[in-house]
C-alpha cells in the first residue's frame, strides 16, 4: 500500500502548516527530523487506494473496494454531526471532552488555550478546547469516592436531586493532566 495522511489528522502533529495545509519543512529541519518520513497529504474524502490482497483475503472484501483517507476523531465527529459551517458549535462528552466551533480561517491563540485544526470541509477549520477527563470522571467518582456498585442510572437519579450549583462544590477534573486551557501533563485537581 501507499502511506499517506489527511489534513485533519496531520493537524495534530505540530509539523503541519494548518493555514496552508502542507508540512512545515523548515520546522521539520530545525527539529532535526528526517524530511522523507512525512507522508503525502490529501483531503479526508479522497481515495487513498484499494484494499490490499492480504486484507481482501482476511476480510472477504473485494480488491476493488476503495479505501478513503478518513479523518481524525474530532473532525469525523464534527462532520458526522453536521458541524461543517461557521456559527455551528459542538460539545462532545466522552472519556475526554471537547467543545469545537467551525471557522472560515485559522485562529491562533498565543496562550495555547485553544487549538486550530483542519476540518474535513476543505476550506474550513475548527477551533477546539478539550479536557482529558470528561465522562471518565464519573467512573473515577463511582470507584474512588463513592465506592458504589449501583448502575450509573441510579447515580444520575440521585445527582438530579442536588440543587443547581451543588451548593458551591467545584470539581476540577485534572485526573490525568490537562490539554486546555493550558497544557500540563502533571496538572491535578
Predicted regions, residues:
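Glycine-rich phosphate-binding loops at beta-strand->alpha-helix junctions
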Residues: 43-51, 71
Amino acid at each position: 500500500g501507499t502511506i499517506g495522511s489527511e489534513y485533519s489528522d496531520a493537524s495534530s502533529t505540530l509539523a503541519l502548516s494548518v493555514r496552508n495545509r502542507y508540512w512545515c519543512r523548515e520546522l521539520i529541519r530545525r527539529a532535526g527530523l528526517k524530511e522523507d518520513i512525512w507522508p503525502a497529504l490529501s483531503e479526508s474524502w479522497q481515495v487513498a487506494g484499494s484494499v490490499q490482497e492480504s486484507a481482501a483475503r482476511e476480510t472477504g472484501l473485494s480488491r476493488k473496494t476503495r479505501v478513503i483517507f478518513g479523518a481524525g476523531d474530532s473532525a469525523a465527529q464534527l462532520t458526522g454531526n453536521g458541524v461543517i459551517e461557521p456559527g455551528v458549535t459542538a460539545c462532545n462528552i466522552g472519556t475526554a471532552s471537547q467543545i469545537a466551533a467551525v471557522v472560515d480561517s485559522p485562529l491562533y491563540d498565543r496562550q495555547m488555550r485553544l487549538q486550530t485544526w483542519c476540518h474535513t470541509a476543505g476550506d474550513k477549520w475548527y477551533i477546539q478546547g478539550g479536557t482529558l477527563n470528561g465522562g471518565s470522571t464519573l467512573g473515577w467518582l463511582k470507584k474512588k469516592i463513592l465506592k458504589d456498585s449501583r448502575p450509573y442510572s441510579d447515580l444520575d437519579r440521585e445527582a438530579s436531586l442536588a440543587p443547581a450549583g451543588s451548593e458551591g462544590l467545584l470539581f476540577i477534573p485534572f485526573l490525568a493532566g490537562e490539554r486546555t486551557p493550558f497544557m500540563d501533563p502533571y496538572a491535578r485537581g
